[in-house]
Every structure is written in C-alpha cells, then in structure tokens.
Amino acid sequence: MAAHELKEALETLKETGVRITPQRHAILEYLVNSMAHPTADDIYKALEGKFPNMSVATVYNNLRVFRESGLVKELTYGDASSRFDFVTSDHYHAICENCGKIVDFHYPGLDEVEQLAAHVTGFKVSHHRLEIYGVCQECSKKENH
C-alpha cells in the first residue's frame, strides 16, 4: 500500500512541475512509511547516512514543497516544534503527554462535524483538527512498574 501511495504522491509533485530529486524522493518515502509524525530533524537524522551532503534546511524546504502540494500536513503544538504527517485520509491524533508519541485514529461519527459547524455558526469551514491528550500504553506501563 505504501508503494502505491508513494507513486501517487510523486505523480502529484510531477504534475505541479516539481522536479523529483533523490533527496526529495527519500524524504517523501520516509514520510509515507512513517507512522511517527516525524520532525524535520527526525527525517534528517534518519536520512543523513544515505545523503551525507543533505542539510536540515534541505529537509525543511522539501517539507514546505510537500505541504504546498497538499501531500503533507504540518502539525504544530505548544512546544514550538512542527511534526509532519503524510496526508492519506482524514484522521485525528492521540498525543502522549509524557513522551510526545502521536497515534492516528479515525472516528466516523465526526465525519459530519464540518457541515454541522457550518450550519450552526454560518462559517465557511475549511478544515478541522482534533487532538486527544493522555498517556500512551508504553508510558503507562513504565509508571506502573
């Protein structure tokens, strides 16, 4: 499935006139395969062995291109660091308050929330974001030992 998503994402970039460099391909592939919502620094550290001449700025520039193409969402939280999420479908995030781990989940009951909000408020709704905060299973196990 990830190979298909990567191929589609590369096609999207090509259609918008973006040149596919080896670094760009690797960064996108990392995002498609990552469920960890990495920071730019995480991506840089994961790929620096394969691309020793690549800088963190290169990663940020590519993430900006991906975001502008609609392939990646930038998730900002209160700690001033951005995390990046490859956009496959609408989903929400459960975030561990101890370790910062982010887990995706989907709740079909919220699919109509934008229409309801638009109806109730008169807003022209563009999107929404839901975050649930708590303690992940791994951190809970550590606390109980």
Curated annotation (Swiss-Prot):
Belongs to the Fur family. Its main location: cytoplasm. It is found in: Cytoplasm. GO terms for cellular component: cytoplasm; protein-DNA complex. Possibly oxidized on a cysteine residue; the Cys-SOH formed in response to oxidative signaling may rapidly react with a Cys-SH to form a disulfide bond, leading to the loss of metal ion and inactivation of repressor function. Oxidized PerR can be further reduced by thiol reductants and repressor activity restored. Zn(2+) binds at residues 96, 99, 136, 139. Changing residue 139 to H: Full repressor activity, but no modulation by peroxide. This is Peroxide operon regulator.
